[in-house]
């Protein structure tokens, strides 16, 4: 076999100088809602695309949305990027923020009681 060095050298130069592909950061986030009174729990994965998402639309087909009402006592990030920031609002009022440093949120604001909150009008806004 005869190798043509003139043909191989350019290919080697391209292969050596090629920069590795960057690992793309996923914009997917998984948020779970739990209801400590009923024992229901559901996690939903969606795009953290800097838009408002309806909590009712995300969770209505899950155990926390049984009976047509999404009720939960807590929210938790279960799969996320290090730069995630999710704000939960209900009826226009901010309930709280979930981040990589604060992955759990008591929705009723009471550490002494588990009071399910109706989240049918809630929105979650996540960005990376």
Report residues per predicted region.
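Mature, structured extracellular domains of secreted fungal proteins
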Residues: 19-128
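Fungal secretory targeting signals
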Residues: 1-25, 128
């Amino acid at each position: 076999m005869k190798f043509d060095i003139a043909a191989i050298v350019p290919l080697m130069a391209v292969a050596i100088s090629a920069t590795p592909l960057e690992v793309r950061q996923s914009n997917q986030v998984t948020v779970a809602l739990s209801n400590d009174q009923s024992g229901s729990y559901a996690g939903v994965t969606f795009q953290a695309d800097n838009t408002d998402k309806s909590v009712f639309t995300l969770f209505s087909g899950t155990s926390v949305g049984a009976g047509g009402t999404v009720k939960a006592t807590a929210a938790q990030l279960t799969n996320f990027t290090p730069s995630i920031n999710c704000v939960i609002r209900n009826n226009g009022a901010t309930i709280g923020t979930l981040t990589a440093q604060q992955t759990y949120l008591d929705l009723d604001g009471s550490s002494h009681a588990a009071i399910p909150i109706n989240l049918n009008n809630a929105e979650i806004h996540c960005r990376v």
